[in-house]
Regions:
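A helix-centric hydrophobic-segment signal that preferentially recognizes long
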Residues: 2-190
């Protein structure tokens, strides 16, 4: 009878340990899945912030182009290029398209500023300098927001590519995300 109690007690202890380990594993999987979902939500929020920074820059550009478009009729291709770039940015739906369109917009902005300074230097006023400062500020915000997005994207990609996240990703269909290309504006000179 004493041996049976020891066997029974040992069996219950073993089952308890196995049950505890299973609970820990399930709990950790749930924790990882919740973390992945939180990162996914954060990615969406960061992407919204990047788009808001693009829109703020667009409003500043409207001021600048409004001041110069009528005076720079000979260089209407500069404005056409900028309008097409802005339209491509508005149509972009994923991170890669947004990133590529942003590079085109930045190139068009640089071209506009270069033409202004080169051919229409006599039109520059303190008001224009203020708008150029606003554009620089908008670019800094874009760099900050895209860097924030990229940091979360790297965490998200790491979480879904490594165990146990990769296991959960295959079950729940999580896919990796791309990062934005970040322009180093310090390298740009006119």
């Amino acid at each position: 009878m004493a041996k049976e109690k020891k066997k029974s007690l040992g069996l219950w202890i073993t089952l308890g340990i196995i049950g505890f380990v299973i609970l820990l594993m399930v709990g950790s999987l749930v924790f990882v899945e919740v973390s992945i979902n939180n990162l996914s939500t954060s990615l969406e929020q960061k992407q919204t912030e990047v788009i808001a920074a693009y829109e703020a820059r667009s409003k500043t550009l409207e001021k600048l182009t409004g001041m110069f478009e009528s005076k720079m009729k000979l260089n209407s291709d500069v404005f056409t290029r900028l309008e097409k770039a802005e339209a491509a940015l508005e149509k972009a739906e994923d991170v890669k398209a947004l990133s590529d369109a942003n590079l085109v917009v930045d190139s068009a902005i640089d071209n506009l500023i270069f033409v202004m300074r080169d051919k229409y230097y006599y039109l520059e006023t303190p008001e224009v300098w203020e708008i150029e400062d606003e554009i620089d500020s908008a670019r800094s915000r874009i760099v900050l927001k895209t860097t924030d997005y990229n940091d979360v994207a790297k965490d998200y990609n790491f979480a879904i590519e490594n165990f146990p996240g990769d296991f959960l990703s295959s079950i729940f269909g999580h896919e990796g995300t791309e990062t934005f290309q970040i322009v180093d504006y310090d390298d740009i000179t006119f």
